[in-house]
A protein has these predicted regions:
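Helix-turn-helix repeat elements of alpha-solenoid scaffolds
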Residues: 1-12, 40-51
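Short coil/turn linking the two alpha-helices of tandem helical-hairpin repeats
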Residues: 2, 22-24, 39-41, 61, ...
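TPR-repeat structural position
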Residues: 5-6, 43-44, 82, 88-91
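Solenoid-like repeat scaffolds
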Residues: 13-24, 51-63, 97-107
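"A position-specific structural signal for the A-helix of alpha-solenoid helical repeats
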Residues: 25-39, 69-71, 75-78, 121-122, ...
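Residues that mark the junctions of alpha-helical repeat units in TPR/alpha-solenoid scaffolds
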Residues: 26, 65-67, 115
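Extended, well-ordered alpha-helical segments in internal regulatory regions
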Residues: 72-83, 127-134
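C-terminal non-catalytic interaction modules
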Residues: 89-169
Length: 169
């Protein structure tokens, strides 16, 4: 994935000056840069970019807001799972805030909310698995199998390949 994003990053750097809407060009570039670092497992750098460029929950540029916040939640979950002393409150607060945001009337239709709601459901299940079931090592593999089965039941879900990766770790 990293090589693919090297090409995308190079493309964005070359094309950014030619985009008419400079604000949109900057958002697109920064989001590309965030994804570039995310797929290199550099979650702290990804979060720094996202926190700099995207104010929380703006309705103008909704597609960018949804992608940025989904990516932010992925980073917080990965850091919570991978770094022993990382504060899990970051994940829990971001997930709850995003749930409230997408649930607000007029932000998204019910059909468009569903993949994000399913994403949050799975993120919370992965979070709980890593902090409850992993205390008993004998439950690790059966727990992963259950989580993967639960994930496969979702027809519409955001970030499914990444969620699979998190479960398999």
């Amino acid at each position: 994935a990293v090589g693919k994003f090297d090409i995308q990053l190079s493309f964005m750097e070359r094309c950014k000056p030619y985009l008419e809407n400079k604000e949109e060009a900057e958002k697109a570039y920064q989001l590309t840069l965030a994804y570039y670092h995310f797929f290199q497992d550099n979650y702290h750098k990804t979060l720094a970019i996202l926190n700099d460029i995207y104010p929380r929950y703006i309705t103008g540029g909704l597609a960018y807001t949804l992608r940025a916040n989904t990516l932010q939640i992925c980073c917080y979950l990965a850091l919570t799972v991978r770094e022993k002393h990382y504060d899990s409150d970051h994940f829990e607060n971001a997930a709850e805030s995003f749930r409230k945001f997408i649930s607000r009337e007029g932000i998204l239709s019910a059909e468009k909310k569903k993949p994000f709601q399913n994403f949050l459901t799975m993120c919370n299940a992965i979070f709980k698995f890593h902090f409850k079931e992993l205390m008993d090592k004998s439950r690790k593999e059966p727990g992963k199998v259950r989580l993967l089965a639960k994930l496969e039941k979702f027809y519409r879900i955001t970030s499914k390949p990444w969620l699979k990766k998190m479960i398999r770790e």
